[in-house]
Amino acid sequence: MTGDGVNDAPSIKSADIGIGMGITGTDVTKNVADMVLSDDNFATIVGAVAEGRRIYDNIRKAIGFLLASNMSEVLGVFFSALLGFTLLNPVHLLFINLITDCFPALALGMERPEPDIMRRPPRSAKDGIFSGGLGFDIAYQGILITVITMVSYIIGHCMEAGCFEMPRGVSPHGMTMAFLTMSMCEIFHSFNMRSQRRSVFTLRGHNKVLWAAMLG
């Protein structure tokens, strides 16, 4: 809802998004509006909607990446404890959380808008942050990274022991393999999170900040 006069104030206040005019609008309208057009140009609304959708998408990408990564760490430590071996040391988990996860998540917040961002229907106000299949994606991606990491630990342990056997206690080779595998999986997973709808190979442009976070 847009308006500039005092009579528009009730409608602007009750609308999901009330927009007031910054130049010709009254003070009453500006005070109750959710957004004020400083240039009174309706075309600015289009740019504001696109930017709002980009920010919301990027928040979902960062949250999805962090939760899937942390889920894989929690599940890996939990199941390895049940099986009687140590998957990762606390210092490994600290490094992954502070270095491997932190910078790619920040880089995902700077992702460019996707090409179809303005062709999507409006999002319902009742939709949660995990709607649209994001919750399911987090679950299966976290489980997948966990399985890959634990398999790499077993392979490293078998290489150290010289034969196939279930690990017990602490295996330096297995722990090294698990640490490197989980770190690389989460780094590549950050590229996977650039879009929930499109393949990373079909996205136009590059997120230079994400590449810098990976190489760093």
Regions picked out by a protein language model, each given a short descriptive name:
Residues 1-32:
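Acidic, Mg2+-coordinating phosphoryl-transfer loop and its flanking beta/alpha structural elements
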Residues 4, 211-212:
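Short, mixed-charge, low-aromatic patches
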Residues 20-200:
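Membrane-embedded transport module
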Residues 201-211:
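Cytoplasmic-side transmembrane-helix entry/capping segments in multi-pass membrane proteins
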Residues 216:
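C-terminal substrate/ligand-recognition segments
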